[in-house]
Structures are given as C-alpha cells and as structure tokens.
Amino acid sequence: MEARVEQFIENNRLFGMETNVLVAVSGGPDSMALLAIMANLREKWKLNLFGVHVNHRLRGEESNKDAELVQSFSARLGVPCNVKDVDVAAFKAEHHVGTQQAARALRYQVFQGEMERVHATVLLTAHHGDDEVETAFMKLTRGTTPLTKLGIAATRPFANGVLARPLLEETKRSIVAYCHEKAIPYRIDQSNFSDAYTRNRFRMNMAPYLVEENPHIHKHIGRFDRWQEEDNHYLMEQAKAHLDQILTKKSEKSIELEIQALCLAPFPLQRRMIHLILNYLHLNVYGVNDMRVFPDAIEQIQAFLQTSAPSAQLDLPGRVQVKRSYGTCLFTTAPFIETKAYCHLLSIPGKVDTPLGVIRADTREELLELEHTDAVSFQVSQVAFPLYIRNRKPGDKLSPSGMSGSKKVNRLFIDRKVDRAKRDAWPLLVDANDSILWVPSLQTSRILTRSANVQGELLHVTFSQHKWP
C-alpha cells in the first residue's frame, strides 16, 4: 500500500522533495494510516512533517481520547503534532448553521492557521476511494451540476499552498488491513454509524453494493472527473473573463452587474458566472470556499433576472440575497436596512441621523444658489414650525415644485428609480402640519417656492448620504 500511495503522490504531483507537509489526523484508521505512511516516506522525500488534530468537543470524553491517541502515536513516530480545541456550539449560534457545517468550517480554519504557523505548503487529508464513491452519489442524488467535480479532487488550492489527498485510490478495506498489518492504533467514531447523517446512510446502505458490483468503481469515477474537469476548466476561465467585463461594482460582500450583459451571455457561461459569484460571497461569509450550488438555485436566479418587475428581491440559503433594481442586479451578503417608523424633531441649528444619512439645518443670511438636490434653502416665514424628519407613511403625497397637483411619494421613488430597500428608510422633511416640504435628493415642495423678494431669516437644510453597498 505504501508503494501505491507513493506512486499516486508522484503521478499527481501532490508535492515535491524537501516540502513542509502538515497531516490532518482525526484518530480514525484512515488518517492514522496516512500519518504512518508519511512518516515512513519522510526521510526519502526529505520532508518536514507535522500533524494537527482538531478536538470538536462534540463527544465528551470520547473526543478527548481521540486527541490523546493522536498525540501519543505522533510522538511515537517523532512527528510534532498540535491539538486544537474549537467551540462548535458558539460558531453555530453566530453563523446560524448546522453542527456538521460549523465543525467543518472551524476545522479548516485551524488547518489554515497551523499551515501558517509551521510554514507548510501542503495539507494532507485522508479521504479515500470509498469516500469518493459516497461523495459522487450524494452529489447526484441531491442534484449536482457539471460546474463542480462529481467526486473528490486529488488537490485543491488551500491557504498558502494546496490541500492534497494521497489515499484517493485506496479502499477503506485496504486501509484497515494496513493498520492491522502495521499495528497502527486507531479509534472508531461511533457517530459514523448514525443514520442521522446523510453520508453515513450512503456509506452503510449504498456504497457496499456498488463496490461489490465493481471493486474499481472509485477509479472509474476518478477518470470521469478528470475528463469533465478539463472541459469545465476551459468554460470556467471563459466565464471568469466575461464576468470581469460585465461587473460594475465589487466589494467584499457584494457584486453588482448589468442584467442585460449577464442575460446575453450563452447559458453555459451564465450558469458559471452565477456559480462564481455565489462562491465568492460564500467565501467572505464563512471563510471556506465550499458553496454547494444546486441546479435549481442557479435556474431560479436566471428566471429571477428575466422577470418584468423593475425591482425585486430573491433570498437564498447562506445569507445571500439577489436584488434587481431596474437594469442592475446586486448579489450581496450585506444586511439590508430594516427600518421602523421614525420621526425626529429637527432643531435649528441641529442635525438628525437617519438610516440613510444625516440631515443638518442652520440659518443663513443669504439664499444659496444650489446646484444639486442634496440641499434646500428657504425663508423661515414660509413654513410652519417645528420641523420634523420622518420616513414615509402609507399614502404620503407632496405638491412638487414646478408642477400642478400632487404626487405620491411612492410614485416619486418609482419614477426616480430609488432602490426598494431604501424607500422605507428615506428621510422626509415635514412641517408642523405634517406637510412634506422636501424629499432629500429628489424633490422639493411648492411650499418652498422662492419669492421674488427674499426677506427675513433663511434656513439651509442638507442631506449627506451614507455609503451603500
């Protein structure tokens, strides 16, 4: 088995000579066998070898015994091994995810930190051929896409190097036999036999029959994946280049683009661009680039972008929201403003903080000639005091300057293409009679129409908007 694993390392160029290698060791037979094999190859390959164990503290004393066994076996092999405890419950509460997702995210955070600490460029995990079969059929069952691998990759970029899986062509049976042959100790996690987890159900109920039909099924899945991966790599590079061309804004938590530019692209590129966007946002939320994109999610987004409504919002799992506003589409994880009704007295001089920005008021001796709509200047005698800053109410209307009749504030927002997420938070300047004097940045009322002969004290009100993702 050692010779096969070494050949796999060479064929797939998992790492070279004189490399700093970190092995993730859980205490189970797979990772303990991997650690032993790497310890045997250490001198020949001139490796600096390290181990890391993550104690998720999910099984009480059993978890502690796993950690103790890993430490003692690593010491026996002369491999420095660091054990790190993590708080899965706290991560679950903060990020609103399940136990398995929280444990995985924390585990890989530890792996990244440990790679940096020991200056490792390669992280080895003990995924094997049976895992590949389980993974492939789990993905097919839940609805995978050709955008991602069907099985498990031999390598992938991770932290400041790569994550590699040297045991992918080995079966579970061969690994356990190796442990018995070499007297390698290991522990069995009893939760691996629980029907509560999807992977366990596939492992116990489906995989044995598939392996019985063809003991080399994991190799066939691997070959299928390699061919598909080459095809997908080419299409994904095309999608990345096209996405870079149509992006209008990009931040850590949001991506904005023109809807028409996305919809004009061929469907294979559309799907891959959406996939790239979701992965980018998911990485910034959880710190792990493992977003599982279901086909119906991608198609749902495509259909959403084709709707005739000028503005709409789509909520997706993973705290991702897709918002279309007229010709643009915003993919974001940034929280949208949730505004309750507010009404604040506007002191003169003074200021009012609103969810969208700051309103300031002061008196002036001269009427300003304004060249923008973020400020308004008028005679104090024109309005009924006190003045207030509030957000909109149902049925709000104003009498627009330069127009006859009245206009609903909601219609004003629509006509001026104000983002739906901002409308309920938008500040309005009203007088003592609750008449709308000014919709900042959008419209003034006829009440503030300037007279030919300006006399008396003048009031100047400005609106400074916050930055919006």
UniProtKB/Swiss-Prot annotation:
Principal cellular location given in the protein's record: cytoplasm
Amino acids binding ATP: S26, G27, G28, P29, D30, S31
Catalytic activity: cytidine(34) in tRNA(Ile2) + L-lysine + ATP = lysidine(34) in tRNA(Ile2) + AMP + diphosphate + H(+)
UniProt protein name: tRNA(Ile)-lysidine synthase
Alphabetic keyword roster: ATP-binding, Cytoplasm, Ligase, Nucleotide-binding, tRNA processing
CDD domains: TilS_N
GO annotation terms (biological process): tRNA modification
Function: Ligates lysine onto the cytidine present at position 34 of the AUA codon-specific tRNA(Ile) that contains the anticodon CAU, in an ATP-dependent manner. Cytidine is converted to lysidine, thus changing the amino acid specificity of the tRNA from methionine to isoleucine.
Domain of life of the organism encoding this protein: Bacteria
Coiled-coil spans in chain: none
Name of the top EC class for this enzyme: ligase
Alphabetized Pfam families for the sequence: ATP_bind_3 (PF01171), TilS_C (PF11734)
Family: Belongs to the tRNA(Ile)-lysidine synthase family.
Domain note: The N-terminal region contains the highly conserved SGGXDS motif, predicted to be a P-loop motif involved in ATP binding.
PANTHER family recorded: TRNA(ILE)-LYSIDINE SYNTHASE-RELATED
Entry's Gene Ontology molecular function annotations: ATP binding; tRNA(Ile)-lysidine synthase activity
Xref: HAMAP family: tRNA_Ile_lys_synt
InterPro entries: Lysidine-tRNA-synth_C (IPR012796), Rossmann-like_a/b/a_fold (IPR014729), TilS/TtcA_N (IPR011063), tRNA_Ile_lys_synt (IPR012094), tRNA_Ile_lys_synt_N (IPR012795)
Keyword check for Chaperone: no
SMART domains: TilS_C
Subcellular localization, as worded in the UniProt entry: Cytoplasm
Organism: Shouchella clausii (strain KSM-K16) (Alkalihalobacillus clausii)
GO cellular component: cytoplasm
EC number: 6.3.4.19
